[in-house]
């Protein structure tokens, strides 16, 4: 199996996300998203541990309203995660498009989008580990950029990078408030 990067689709302070083609034997091909830690952060143990923690945390979150993670890998010193590719828009792009065209989003569509995100969050929060212990996953960064709307109408939550689930992730609890100011509550 190898990956061919097609184009950059998102960029954040600590990482990049690319559309890519996964290639395998017999002409197998699948479009995926690949999330990379920025090279300058790959050398920092805390960032590596958090990236690996995110992959472990979301590996078993299999729900229609959560972007699925397929694989955690490393090439040289560069860590990457392969994820489901969603053909569509993030909610911020969707909202911006409606503002540009001076159109309102119908109330029933807004309720539908929020209800699907709540389903994904509820599933993550109720998820149990292999011993039946509640993980209590809290996303901590729900915002329009982390909500995908597929062309087919599916709504999916992505980027569990600062999520917290008991002690699965490396985290200096109490040292930092995680999330974006506009969306903290």
Region spans (language model):
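Conserved N-lobe ATP-binding subsite of Hanks-type protein kinase domains
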Residues: 16
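AlphaC helix of the eukaryotic protein kinase fold
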Residues: 38-60
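Activation-segment/catalytic-loop signature of the eukaryotic protein kinase fold
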Residues: 72
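Conserved short submotifs of the Hanks-type protein kinase catalytic core
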Residues: 76-90, 94
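AlphaC helix of the protein kinase catalytic domain
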Residues: 91-105
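Activation segment signature within eukaryotic-like protein kinase domains
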Residues: 113-114
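Protein kinase catalytic-loop region centered on the HRD/HxD motif
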Residues: 119-137
């Amino acid at each position: 199996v190898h990956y061919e990067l097609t184009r950059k689709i998102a960029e954040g302070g600590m990482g990049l996300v690319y559309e890519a083609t996964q290639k395998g034997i017999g002409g197998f091909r699948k479009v995926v998203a690949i999330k990379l830690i920025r090279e300058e952060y790959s050398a920092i143990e805390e960032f590596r541990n958090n990236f690996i923690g995110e992959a472990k945390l979301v590996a078993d979150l299999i729900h229609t309203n959560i972007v699925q993670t397929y694989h955690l890998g490393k090439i040289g010193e560069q860590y990457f995660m392969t994820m489901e590719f969603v053909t569509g828009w993030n909610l911020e792009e969707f909202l911006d498009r409606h503002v540009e065209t001076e159109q309102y989003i119908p109330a029933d569509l807004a309720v539908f989008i929020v209800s699907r995100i709540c389903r994904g969050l509820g599933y993550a929060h109720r998820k149990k580990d292999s011993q039946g212990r509640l993980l209590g996953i809290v996303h901590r960064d729900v915002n329009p950029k982390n909500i995908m709307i597929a062309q087919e109408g599916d709504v999916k939550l992505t980027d569990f990078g600062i999520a917290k689930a008991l002690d699965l992730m490396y985290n200096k609890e109490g040292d930092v408030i995680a999330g974006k100011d506009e969306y903290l509550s």
